[in-house]
Amino acid sequence: MKHLLVTNDFPPKIGGIQSLLWEWWRRLPPDSFAVLTSPYAGAAAFDAEQAFHIERTREPVLLPHPWMVQRINTMARDVGADLIVLDPALPLGLVGPSLDLPYDVVLHGAEVTVPGRLPLSKQTLGYVLRRARHIVAAGGYPAAEAEHAAGRALPITVVPPGVDTDRSHPLADSERAQARADFGIPDDAELLVSISRLVPRKGFDTAIRAAALLHSSRPRLLLAIAGGGRDEQRLRGLATSLDAPVRFLGRVSNDDLPRLYGCADAYAMLCRNRWGGLEQEGFGIVFLEAAACGVPQIAGDSGGAAEAVDHGVTGLVVRHPDDPREVAAAIEALLDDPAQARRMGAAGRERAVREFSYDVLAHRLGTSLGALAD
């Protein structure tokens, strides 16, 4: 069965969802789907390199209006599609019930959580989801939120974000030492790495406070923070005021990220809920990237983070990620027991390969869409 993917979020546009869709769909048979998406700088060259068919609208954004319904129906007929796949559920998914063909919806997280908690938008979202043939959810968390919005069970396949386990892998001792040297990190540091956008929901301030609490008893502790964002100046000021053992690395290139993960003793992101639960962690691909590098993880209990980190097996999930003392205790639990940390790192790597390899996930996606044989 051939399908047409309709989305605003597709490469060469850069972002987490764009990367996720690319990693999923580029592994499907190229004759099993086509893509309708919005224009973007450099798209012509990118599209020409692909084995599958891509069309782009003149309008900068795909919105749910009658013209879009006609555009989707026309392209679906032209490419011989049997199914439409809409990403995201809102607002683009509103065209679904008016299409000539059955439609599936892709769900990621925030675009389900926020509308699902507000009465009018919950009703609209529920209508789109109930009319869909099938739902592809990027984790159990958005799947549960979808059924809450729909008011009933839905036909859902969970296809979580994945990780390139060839690109992200454990480092040999010599590689680890060289990576630390390249990042300017002492070889004997008890290194806690945190990589993400610097925004309040990610909990960097709690990690900084926890590191400050441990500084006197663990003089070799270092928290290395990589990334940029609107919270950076506040976080720098907090680290300075607490005399916390923190180093801000700025934005690290994608090529260097596996080396930064791999030279850590543990990875931490204390993600947390905000605005009464309207803002939560969708899944947390950074935890999978750390796991693929054989590094244990410390996560805040928010949204899908507890799916990404298997508590007590691949890392630790902190139930109260706003509490620096609870976070400090989790850090010490890993640093005080290197054997346990190594076991968790090895278990994380094995799980990443077994459950979160993009090849495995793309096969699950393709089967759910009828693009592959069962």
Protein language model annotation of sequence segments:
Residues 4, 186-202, 208-212:
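Conserved donor-binding/catalytic core segment of Leloir-type glycosyltransferases
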Residues 39, 141, 162:
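Carbohydrate-associated surface elements
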Residues 169-185:
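A short helix/loop element that forms part of the nucleotide-sugar donor recognition site in Leloir-type
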Residues 233-258, 266:
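Nucleotide-activated donor-binding/catalytic signature segment of Leloir-type glycosyltransferases, i.e.
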Residues 262-280, 295:
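Acidic donor-binding loop of glycosyltransferase active sites
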Residues 287, 291-292, 296-299, 309:
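Short hydrophobic beta-strand element within catalytic cores of glycosyltransferases
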